[in-house]
Amino acid sequence: MMVNRKILTLDEFTIQQMRAFPHATGELSNLLRDLGLAAKRINVEVNKAGLVDILGDAGEINVQGEDVKKLDVYANNQVMGVLKHGISCAGIGSEELDDFIAFDDPVSNNSKYVCMFDPLDGSGNIDVNVSIGTIFSVYRRVTPKGQPVSREDFLQAGINQVAAGYIVYGSSTMLVYATRRGVNGFTLDPSIGEFSLSHPNIQCPEFGKIYSVNHGNFFQYEKPVQDYIQVCQQKTKETGGPYTQRYIGSMVSDLHRNLIKGGIFMYPATKDKPKGKLRLLYECNPFAFIVEVAGGKATNGKVRILDIVPTELHQRSTLFIGSKGMMEELESFLQRENA
């Protein structure tokens, strides 16, 4: 079979990007390739999850107070394993772990990056065949090289991210990552076992016709959010609509669709969860970085997500994220509450 050499693989693309910086060490390229390897391994297990004993609970509760799925454990071990045995990551923080882990060895202590990740977002949906995903975020350490990383290396504002991305395991497996140079998407080609560049220079449309929110919690939301949702429902062709509501319950899938097609995703505070439910470091920051690089916006309803300085590893947040024009329309409603 002839391979189309006009399509770059993930490895080739990251090397090409590195060559634009004469003094680059290649550590970030290596780290991204390591994450690509973990994604391939997780993809294999996701695709056969219904055939082997990997569905269901692992009999554990994670730091979030949630039942840990067997596939969560597998995915967490795969991401942690490739980063630990690579040469570019000094330590990791995972949604599934109580605390960060410093890879305290001579090579890792001299690495300049730390990685935060949600190993398997939406795993509660896998037994009904809904797309799920992995989310990751890369920061440059702030402590001196040559020693183990510490908590301050992880408690950084999202604006300090060097790269962020996600993998969606669906009808095809796709890896999307952003640096300050742009957002690019790679689809796993099963014929060669490589992620190949399929969506170069992704731009989030300024407007879309999709809004994503859990309508089941409508009466728990603050009034400005309720008002905006009702406006979305009432949009007509004359007012830029009609809008359609799409909410899968798998954050990676919802945000991937809205990034490509244009739209807005909302996870507001509720009476039960006044601080929000999503994890700032593992979910909000990575997607805020990706969407902003692509031309969109992300806030917690009051301030820009990327400006929030975290005080704990598992800090929660509300999230409003998506197309710039739709976000600005939403903000006009939220500002009434904050005025």
Please state what every model-predicted region is.
Residues 66-69:
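Alpha-helical scaffold segments that form or flank carboxylate-/histidine-based iron centers
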Residues 2-53, 60-62, 73-339:
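IMPase-like, lithium-sensitive Mg2+-dependent phosphomonoesterase catalytic core
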